[in-house]
């Protein structure tokens, strides 16, 4: 999957990703009015406004950029209607040929981590059938619970030819409270980065890695 992203970057000459992080008060007023006229000032109306704005952003940029990164929590705040808008956004971005990085920052262990991995990158079994959930191309994950939280994602990535971006050093102001703490003279995030690199090498297929490191900076039409 990383090869697909690299190819898209090379084709567009744009090593960037557009964040789709819904903030209703940033959605243009005419889009809000149209959505509220149809669905009322409800969660459904808010989700429709977000979806329509996302669609306009994608329509304006899909041939200029390689990838988008919708932030799932910003959709979840609108309940099930927001989650539906997230899925519609993912599907539409795929239709337009974009790589989709699900900014989900999952970080749990065991069966919970497995469920997150299946839900975002894999397929869930229902009787004799299998269905993709959100079906992003990549997911962001938090490694600070250890390998228990990462290995289920790597397993699904290998099965489905998907990829991960693993948080190593984040840009939030308080990140240094833990990530910069010294262990044997080196900050914790360097140790984590080395482990992420090892996971990537361990699970390479020819020249392709399924695991990448993420050091945070971003731009979004919503900011």
Walk through the language-model features, giving the residues of each:
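Glycine-rich, proline-tolerant flexible connector loops at the mouths of alpha/beta enzymes
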Residues: 46, 70-82
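N-terminal glycine-rich anion-binding loop in soluble enzyme alpha/beta folds
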Residues: 1-60
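Positively charged, low-complexity/disordered segments
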Residues: 212-223
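Catalytic PLP-binding core of fold-type I/II PLP enzymes
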Residues: 87-108
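Active-site beta-loop-alpha junctions enriched in small/polar residues
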Residues: 19-25, 73-75, 105-109, 142-144, ...
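Conserved anion-binding
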Residues: 108-207
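Conserved, mostly hydrophobic/aromatic
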Residues: 18, 68, 103, 139
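Acidic (Asp/Glu)-rich catalytic clusters
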Residues: 58-64, 95, 154-159
